[in-house]
């Protein structure tokens, strides 16, 4: 089967849904194989507990670190090119969980890529990164202990040295095979920079963490595959080991398809006015039938419903409550309008509480990061 059929574009991977086929092709293991070992360390965050995290590479190494009280690090990044929405929250919920288990957190602000590939101004990039993302992360519960936040354009010289060294052992043919032929210089720079993001915590200058976990959506797997190959090529010279990774599903957008920052109608942003967010929710696509009569007879389809997914991954904490919502929908006992009203009230309470915390976090966010000079 030609590789082009399975190529994943990290800059535009709309509609990636056939996870099992993709995982089999790229050698990703089901996360359900290892989740029972993670349960030993306490309550799991909703994305893990309710099946949104579906795949992994080498997660056993992270489990070994936890079981032996060894150090490990999390590398995550943010793309400051739009509003932070609930799809992004699904990732940071995982990061906060691992931080509470003792992980050192490295948070890369991808300002180089936002400027070079997404074509935003430097001022926009910096303001979005801090006010829209870092501040929200802090309000959601990310702690400042064991936390390292940096702009890709304003970090330490050892990090930049990695980018230069990596360029020697990566070929254009390899990049084209992974990313396709539409590779402008800005994308090549972004790719090598992300490899440095993922591997630099292993250097002694940054703590020498030999176990680094990168939780991502499947669209970012091309970067992980390339970085694992780079780690192999520098295993003797720099002592690098392959990073571990986990993969989560995309959160379904309110209009169907992927929740995306480029489609405002598809997402619930954490900073939007509460009434505006509730209004979006009330207009959302659902897993309901064509008529109320048909839904009472056949039942709804919560597994296809973005409104149910918001409850599942963000708004309903108790499993028994979620189970009742699911069963009432499937049986036709509850219609979509009733479900939307109840979900809207949960969303309102969540956003009001979150935005109250957020108000005090913007100044704190700016105090944690050294800003680029230009």
What are these regions (language model features)?
Residues 1-2, 134-136, 169-181, 206-222, ...:
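Short flexible/disordered coil segments
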Residues 157-163, 226, 254-258:
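Short, solvent-exposed polar/charged micro-motifs at secondary-structure junctions
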């Amino acid at each position: 089967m030609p590789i082009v059929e399975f190529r994943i574009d990290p800059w535009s991977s709309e509609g990636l849904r056939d996870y099992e086929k993709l995982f089999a092709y790229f050698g990703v293991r089901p996360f359900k194989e290892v989740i029972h070992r993670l349960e030993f360390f306490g309550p799991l965050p909703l994305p893990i507990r309710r099946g949104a995290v579906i795949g992994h590479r080498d997660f056993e190494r992270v489990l070994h670190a936890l079981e032996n009280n060894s150090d490990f690090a999390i590398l995550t990044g943010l793309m400051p090119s739009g509003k932070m929405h609930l799809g992004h929250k699904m990732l940071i919920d995982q990061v906060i969980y691992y931080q509470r288990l003792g992980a050192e957190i490295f948070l890369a602000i991808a300002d180089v890529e936002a400027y070079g590939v997404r074509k935003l101004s430097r001022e926009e990039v910096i303001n979005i990164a801090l006010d829209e993302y870092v501040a929200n992360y802090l309000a959601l519960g990310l702690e400042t202990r064991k936390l390292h936040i940096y702009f890709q354009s304003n970090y330490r010289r050892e990090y930049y040295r990695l980018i230069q060294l990596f360029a020697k052992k990566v070929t254009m043919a390899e990049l084209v095979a992974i990313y396709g032929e539409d590779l402008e210089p800005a994308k090549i720079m972004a790719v090598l920079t992300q490899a440095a993001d993922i591997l630099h915590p292993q250097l002694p200058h940054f703590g020498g963490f030999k176990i680094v976990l990168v939780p991502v959506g499947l669209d970012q797997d091309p970067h992980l595959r390339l970085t694992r190959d780079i780690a192999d090529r520098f295993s003797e010279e720099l002592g690098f080991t392959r990073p571990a990774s986990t993969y989560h599903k995309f959160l379904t957008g309110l209009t169907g398809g992927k929740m995306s920052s480029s489609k405002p109608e598809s997402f619930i942003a954490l900073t939007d006015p509460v009434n505006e967010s509730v209004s979006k929710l009330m207009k959302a696509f659902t897993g309901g039938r064509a008529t109320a009569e048909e839904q009472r007879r056949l039942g709804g389809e919560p597994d296809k419903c973005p409104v149910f997914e918001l409850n599942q991954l963000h708004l309903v904490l108790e499993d028994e409550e979620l189970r009742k919502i699911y069963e009432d929908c499937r049986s036709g006992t509850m219609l979509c309008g009733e479900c939307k009203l109840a979900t809207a009230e949960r969303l309102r309470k969540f956003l009001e509480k979150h935005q109250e915390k957020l108000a005090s976090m913007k100044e704190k966010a700016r105090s944690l990061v050294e800003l680029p000079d230009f």
